[in-house]
Amino acid sequence: MAEPLLTIRDLSVAFETAGQRVEAVKRVSLDIGKGETLALVGESGSGKSVTALSVLQLLPYPLARHTPETRILFEGEDLVRASPRQLQAIRGGRVAMVFQEPMTSLNPLHTVEKQIAETLLLHKGMRGPAARARVIELLRLVGLPEAEKRLDAYPHQLSGGQRQRIMIAMALANEPDLLIADEPTTALDVTIQAQILKLLRDLQERFGMALLLITHDLTIVQKVATRVAVMTRGEIVETGVTAEVFAQPQHPYTRHLLESAPKGQPVRHTKTPPVLLQAKGFKVWFPIRTGVLRRTTGYVKAVDGIDVTVREGETLGVVGESGSGKTTLGLGLLRLLKSEGAIVYDGKRLDPLGTGAMRPLRREIQIVFQDPFSSLSPRLSIGQIVEEGLKVHRIGETPKARRALIEDALTSVGLDPATIDRYPHEFSGGQRQRVAIARALVLKPRLLVLDEPTSALDMSVQAQMVDLLRDLQARHSLAYIFISHDLRVVRALAREVLVMKDGVVVESGDSAAIFERPQHPYTRALMAAAFEIKAEETGAVRT
């Protein structure tokens, strides 16, 4: 191997808070060569992201500490001992990073154009028409439709997948030598995953760019990475050429990862269950206002005349690419967005109800959002976060009774009840998502809207979460609206499926029939991309 671009030697990271010391990373050593892709894989909490953040010295120092033996060399320059000025020149220029949760990484007060142009100005001095042209070029490269129209958009006006594409465009703006990608395709639908991975490979070939890929998706690792390093409990337990590690894993933990995948069949009933939620001709249109007087000149038809039926104790899967209207449909059905069309829940019309009349029903209809870090208050412990709903709905007469309910909810999603007093920033992305699910489950709802609930979870925890959701459904007759781009998880959970594109349903029906014999070309393209990701030279997806 030639001289490495990045050399990590004896990297150790410890966090010291409230008199406690937590060793997150223990004596990790890695090399990445120019143009190489190294995948760092492991379950949530294994230390993957902490390792990546250490490279650019983005940890919360001095709460985080390295040992004196730690060395991180980028082209011979020691980043651990670099000055702030040296680090500023490297960050976003020679080394760029794509973070796991785009909503917390993008500035909510700045437009798309301003945020991407900022890095061009800082590192290349580019401004004005040249910067705008480069921003548009980058947006097109990452597959954002109608790039020119997105320049003035704010992060909250974009879907989760679109926000992640903005992050990737920002990272690629200065053609870095090393791109650190922390779950870069987690929020993306399967077809865009293939295009983004193809884009990253093309950029590597053009610029000799190296890629440190942090992911829990072993399908992506197998198809993209040159080498792989497997991490658990802060230590690397196996490294090697990807094909060899997948063919003959040596460590028991590696074998455990490779055997983990969502399995099983959705809950099925001998008799057709009663309808719990139904909507007819359901619409969510967003007005387009232009001019000084902000007159409405048109509408974005995010959801356009959809019929939805959810039965008691069953799962309705809603699938489609980012921007198809999946999340908007879920928020609209919950009366969190202005909508048109009748919504009937348990025989009651919801659409005419005001805020006060809806409140008692909020306990029965809960939601788990896509981005857990945005939906969890950083100022509250996870115990307080889960307790909020109990207080609002007056469940549990005493703090002791509420604490018992909270601990049961945390245990049910695979979290140690002893972590009840810790804060969201002390958890990994996957662990935060489990907190969000516990917050919803503690109220024992009848209907749960799950918006990409497993997208931030590693494969083995995905499988555990699917088993958990299926078990809860069987025991409590829970109904789910399961919104996801991960068709493997939908297949394991959903009894019925809606396939959405551009705000309308292109195919719907029994999930087994749709997965085995998809009728619509769009559905067939989604299936092909989900179960075997390959990208043509044009960026189109094929099997």
Report the location of each language-model feature.
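A short, surface-exposed alpha-helical micro-motif characterized by mixed small hydrophobic
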Residues: 221-223, 490-492
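Conserved ABC transporter NBD signature motif
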Residues: 66-78, 341-350
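ABC ATPase "signature
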Residues: 236-240, 248, 505-509, 517
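Conserved ABC ATPase signature
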Residues: 153-158, 162, 423-427, 431
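ABC ATPase NBD coupling module
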Residues: 65, 79-96, 114, 122, ...
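Conserved ABC ATPase "signature" region
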Residues: 77-78, 130-149, 349, 400-418, ...
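A short, proline-enriched helix->beta-strand linker immediately N-terminal to the Walker B motif
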Residues: 173-177, 442-446
